[in-house]
Amino acid sequence: MNWDLRTNAEDGSQRMLNALLPGTVVPAHHHPHSSETVICLCGRMDEVCYDSNGHETERFHLCPADGAYGCQVPAGVWHSVEVFEPSVIFEAKDGAYGKDGSELM
């Protein structure tokens, strides 16, 4: 479930809260023209990065209770999440959802 934080549909950015449960599947994807800021507000999860062949290259542990609040996923990097406990994240990037050139792996 996500909550769009933009003030109107013409806003050219993506800012949202995203609630994720353990077992949530987010297909690996990338944003070719924008980096993505991910801030974990509660819960515990990993942001997982991949190369273009689908091999894991980096993993960011996100858990505010551990002092690990967020990460920056560079433009063009394939990524997904692994959720370990109910979590809420804030996500921000350039380009409106569905209109930013994002692609699934």
Regions found by a protein language model. Give the residues of each.
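Short, surface-exposed charged micro-motifs
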Residues: 17, 37, 80
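Extended, positively charged loop/linker patches that create polyanion-binding surfaces
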Residues: 52-72
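A generic "binding-loop/recognition-motif" signal
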Residues: 24, 33-34, 77, 85
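Glycine- and acidic-residue-biased ligand/ion/polar-headgroup-sensing regions
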Residues: 33-53
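Double-stranded beta-helix
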Residues: 54-61, 78-105
